[in-house]
Amino acid sequence: MNIVLIDSRQTTKDVWKISASRQVEHLKTHVNVQVGDTLRVGVKAGKRYLTEVVAVEEQLVMVRPLHEEVVPAKLSVTLIIAMPRPKVLRRLIMDSVTLGVEKIILLHSYRVDKSYWQSPFLQQLDQYVNLGLEQAGDTIAPQIEIYK
């Protein structure tokens, strides 16, 4: 995780709350975040900020924005692929988002197994996009189109 991606509803005051359990656990165990440390925080579909940690609690990390950072420009790349196997789809979406692809189109072809379209992985695309955005340090998700 190269940035912490939060929803705009978490940024209503001078102090922002990072409350997603996955993010809080990562910050505490892997980053070993302490009060006074700086973190890169991005607002979904918005801007990216350098922030200072003001409080670390059991299920919550609170940060204060210091200044705005430049969000990297998207590559003007459209990735068109036939629906892959579900586990490959997860990796493909995360890696494509990390690379900065602007648009992803998933197609059906005669070689695609119809069961792939009923996979629970399709319901979790937003989670994989968020993981890719956090890895890339980006805040703007690519457009994903699905044609069966």
Predicted regions located by residue number:
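RNA substrate-binding interface of SAM-dependent RNA methyltransferases
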Residues: 70-148
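N-terminal positively charged helical leader segments and presequences
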Residues: 1-69
